[in-house]
UniProtKB/Swiss-Prot annotation:
GO terms for molecular function: structural constituent of ribosome. InterPro entries: Ribosomal_bS16, Ribosomal_bS16_dom_sf. It comes from Streptococcus gordonii (strain Challis / ATCC 35105 / BCRC 15272 / CH1 / DL1 / V288). This is Small ribosomal subunit protein bS16. Pfam families: Ribosomal_S16. Signal peptide: none annotated. Belongs to the bacterial ribosomal protein bS16 family. One of its GO terms (biological process) is translation. Keywords: Ribonucleoprotein, Ribosomal protein. GO terms for cellular component: cytoplasm; small ribosomal subunit. Transmembrane segments: none annotated.
Amino acid sequence: MAVKIRLTRMGSKKKPYYRINVADSRSPRDGRFIETVGTYNPLVAENQVTLKEDRVLAWLENGAQPSDTVRNILSKEGVLKKFHDSKYSK
C-alpha cells in the first residue's frame, strides 16, 4: 500500500480550505484517509498552516510520500529540514 500525504479540499464554493491527510494513494482525493495531520488555509494573507509535526515526521520516516503542494508547505514550515537532519545526522 503506497501512502501519500496530500490535501483534501473542504469549505464551500470559492472559499476553500484544506486538510493535510495521510491516505492510500489509490483512494479518491476527498475519500478515505488514514489520519489528519494538519490544515492549510490559502485565503488568509499569510496562508495559515497548522501541523502536527511529530505525526508528519513519523509518517515520513515510515515512507509516506508527500504530494508536490504538501512538499512545498512542509518545506516552508521547516519540517522537511528536520526530517533531512534526523535522517542523515547518524
